[in-house]
Amino acid sequence: MLSRRHAVSRFIAAPLLALGLLAACAPSEPAFKSTDITGADYGKNFALTDHHGQPRTLADFKGKVVTIFFGYTQCPDVCPTALSGMSTVMQELGPEADRVQVIFVTVDPERDTQELLAEYVPVFDKRFLGMVGAPEKIAEIAKDFRVFYRKSGDLQGHYTIDHTAGTYVFGPDGRLRLYVKHAEDPMVVAADIKALLAGK
């Protein structure tokens, strides 16, 4: 009788053990919904002037999550969509939004003056910062981030700019962590930022 019980116990335990092993081997849920690019070293030479006239580097925002988007003020759709999305993200974050810095880097420094950025960027959220620099400095930083941009039109002031439309996200420790595709659901972005703020 005892041996029969042992046999039954082993019979039951075997599939349970197998299920446990399968669960252990199953891939874990990704920490982020956005693309995890931890380890990329973009932005080491980031140094521009914000729309208040203050020189800035990424070190100025240590302890905060920093998002960086490259665009221009006369962009007809992509840029306002990106900034509006981040405005929604900030609302979703509530008090935690104070630990986030949204940065808009112009790829049109010839037209986007400091004054124009000061009028444009805070419309979406007064905490957002527009960044400008000399054309060669913008080109250097864009190249560092693997951001493409090119003028299209008559180039005499009547032109648009084709440009990369994703957003880069740095963690509070200053490391580049995520790439967010254009028009991503703000709730997804907010969840990823909350995870970074929580130490992931």
Positions of predicted regions on the chain:
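Thiol/disulfide oxidoreductase modules built on the thioredoxin-like
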Residues: 137-192
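A short beta-strand-turn-helix
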Residues: 46-66, 90
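N-terminal export leaders
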Residues: 4-13, 17
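Short loop/turn microsegments at loop-to-beta-strand junctions
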Residues: 43-44, 66, 164-166
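Structural microenvironment flanking redox-active thiols in thiol-disulfide oxidoreductases
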Residues: 81-141
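C-terminal motif of bacterial Sec signal peptides marking the signal peptidase cleavage site
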Residues: 21-24
